[in-house]
Structure formats: C-alpha cells, structure tokens
Amino acid sequence: MRIICAIFCFAAGLCLAGPGESSGLVFNDLEGVPRHPLDPAEKVASVLFFYCQDCPISNSYAPEINRICASHTNFAFYIVQVDPDLTPAAAKEHAREYDLHAPVLLDPQHRLVKLAKATVTPEAVVLGKDGQLLYRGRIDDLYAGLGKKRGAVTQHDLRDALDTITAGKKLKPKETKAIGCLIP
C-alpha cells in the first residue's frame, strides 16, 4: 500500500508541478552536461524528439531534425534515445555518424517516454513552460505507413506547430499520428 501511495504522490507531483518545478528530471547529455528537458528556461518551449538508433525511420529524419533545430532557435531541442540497451559510447558514435546537432539524452528507464506518452520513434513532443502538452505527433507526412515512404513531404506538421506556437496562436490539431518504430 505504501508503494502505491508513493507512486501516486510522485505522479501527482509531476502533473501538478508549476513552471520550472517539473524540471526535477535532469539528464546528462552525451558530453556530461546536465540538461533539464522539461524546463525550456528562456526558450518558448521544449521539443523532445523520441528517437531509436536502430529505427530506419528515425535515422532518415536526422537531417530534417537538424534543419528544424537550426530554423527554430527559440525552442529548446532534445533528442531522446529510448533504447534501454544503448550505451553512452554507442549513442555518441551514432550521434556522430548521423551528425545529430541537438543534445542527445539517454532515457533507458523511459521516464520521459512515459511522461510525454510517446509510443513510436521518431515522435515529436512539444511541452510549454508549465509542462503543458502543446503538440505530440509526427514531424511531417513523409511516411504514410511503415514501409510506405512518400516521394515528397506535403505537410510539415511539427514546423507548422512551432510556427503557430511562436505566433501565440491556438494550435489545431494538437496531436497527429506519428509513423515509426514502436518504442522498446
């Protein structure tokens, strides 16, 4: 019974935390720098890219992730590696091989995965300063389904969401269906 109560209190604390208070989740990036992915500090919001190094769809998005990070510098970006078996050395090698520019965080216990309710990789989640979900879903519509890659992107869902958030407008839709590899 104590365990159930402790779990409930912890979960309630995450849900009820005010601005900056949910930033208790601290992850060291691959360079050892402490990062607070739930606290965008002076940025508009945090953008979490849930990513798995063994997922070909995730890897195909590495250049687009870099372009989004470069064009929307008013957001705090993080690549969240979700594979519980990924070592820091292998993650560093993968980040180098795919030229990932955003800070890479390892989430072997799926703390961020659970909090953001991410289900596949790649999946983007945008969280406001108060921890409020602003957007969750696909980066764009390049994939119509598993193994079904379109010839060209026609909808830039994440870019559109970030532009709408930057403009201070209400986002519709708030969620889109991400296509990718199931989170292990």
Label every model-predicted segment.
Residues 52-63, 84-85, 124, 181-184:
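Short, thiol/selenol-centered motifs that function as redox-active sites or metal-ligating centers
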Residues 5-15:
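Bacterial N-terminal signal peptides
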Residues 40-59, 162:
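Short active-site neighborhood of thiol/selenol oxidoreductases, capturing the structured segment around
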Residues 15-24:
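Boundary at the C-terminal end of the N-terminal hydrophobic targeting segment
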Residues 23, 45, 100-103, 118-125, ...:
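Structural micro-motif
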Residues 128-184:
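Thiol-/selenol-based redox modules, centered on thioredoxin-like
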Residues 25-46:
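A short beta-strand-turn-helix
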Residues 59-98, 106-115:
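Structural microenvironment flanking redox-active thiols in thiol-disulfide oxidoreductases
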